[in-house]
């Protein structure tokens, strides 16, 4: 299951870090060598009032971002307003990724896709439609009814799932999430297959802090630029710092130092309970 794989991922990351420190090599070297000096990032626009979401775009652009992931997946009409208002604030050539995180039913996703289909031509932007529905079958149906570039995320949880989706021409990109694959070992295998298939990726994780971001950065650095579409620096969204030496973020890009292993040192004092759920 998902929690088991996430637990495996933490152990797997630690093993790669140990191997890097033992050999004196950065993890990106062990994963295939540095293919790019800096990794393109996107900025998440969290779901709230449409006008408030749109107001964030100039702020994030001033920080150097040109790729924006817009969280949708609620009421279709409200989501259409969110996407349209954000698109109106964007400049030609910028990337808008409408991410529903499985939140729509199939009929709702079809309504939204049809309502926003002309935005790329009207605004000169690059508009992507990400994981609109929960099941692979629903997503595939939506995919076959829209010309928008399509991203699969939650469905991409194994090598078999990737091969099936590629056979069905179900997507144009995938979100490659390290924790969902059980760590860097399996994620590298999926990454290499995507490169062989000519399939670009968002090199990612589901969430995390400095350590998860370092793993993302090393995998992304070792991925050819044309196949690493965008990534996220999760420690930028966190209020608790759990490690020193996190990747540096500047002008919408992330980079890691040429130090051995993942390049981060856990702050053991931070390993206390931050929050509790019941």
Regions found by a protein language model. Give the residues of each.
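Non-catalytic positions within long, well-ordered alpha-helices that form the structural scaffold/packing
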Residues: 58-61, 117, 121-122, 166-167, ...
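Shared catalytic-loop signature of beta/alpha-barrel
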Residues: 125-126, 134-151, 156-253, 257
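Acidic, glycine-rich loop-and-beta core segments that form the ion-binding/anion-interacting portion
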Residues: 94-150
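Active-site-adjacent beta->alpha loops and helix N-cap segments on the catalytic face
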Residues: 50-52, 74-90, 104-109, 132-143, ...
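A cross-family glycoside hydrolase active-site/sugar-binding cleft signature
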Residues: 42-44, 69-73, 97-101, 130-132, ...
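Active-site groove signature of glycoside hydrolases
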Residues: 66-75, 121-127, 174-175
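N-terminal capping/lid subdomain adjacent to the active-site entrance of alpha/beta enzymes
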Residues: 1-97, 101-110, 114-117, 241-278
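Active-site catalytic pocket residues across diverse enzymes, especially alpha/beta-hydrolases
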Residues: 90, 120, 223
């Amino acid at each position: 299951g998902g929690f088991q794989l996430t637990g495996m991922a933490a152990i797997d990351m630690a093993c790669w870090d140990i191997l890097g420190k033992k050999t004196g090599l950065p993890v990106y070297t062990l994963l295939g060598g540095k293919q790019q000096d800096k990794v393109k990032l996107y900025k998440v626009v969290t779901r709230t009032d449409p006008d408030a979401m749109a107001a964030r775009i100039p702020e994030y652009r001033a920080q150097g971002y040109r790729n924006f992931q817009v969280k949708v997946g609620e009421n279709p009409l409200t989501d259409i307003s969110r996407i349209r208002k954000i698109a109106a604030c964007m400049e030609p050539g910028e990337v808008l990724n409408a991410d529903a995180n499985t939140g729509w039913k199939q009929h709702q996703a079809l309504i939204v896709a049809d309502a926003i289909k002309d935005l790329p031509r009207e605004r000169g932007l690059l508009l992507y439609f990400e994981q609109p529905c929960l099941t692979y079958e629903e997503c595939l149906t939506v995919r076959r009814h829209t010309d928008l570039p399509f991203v699969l995320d939650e469905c991409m949880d194994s090598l078999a799932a990737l091969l099936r989706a590629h056979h069905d021409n179900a997507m144009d990109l995938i979100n490659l999430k390290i924790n969902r694959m059980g760590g860097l070992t399996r994620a590298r295998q999926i990454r290499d297959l995507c490169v062989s298939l000519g399939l670009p990726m968002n090199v990612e994780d589901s969430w995390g802090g400095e350590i998860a971001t370092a793993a993302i950065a090393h995998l992304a650095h070792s991925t050819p630029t044309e196949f690493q579409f965008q990534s996220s620096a999760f420690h930028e969204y966190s209020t608790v710092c759990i490690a020193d030496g996190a990747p540096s973020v500047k002008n919408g890009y992330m980079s890691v130092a040429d130090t051995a292993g993942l390049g981060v040192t856990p702050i053991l004092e931070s390993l206390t309970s931050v929050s509790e759920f019941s």
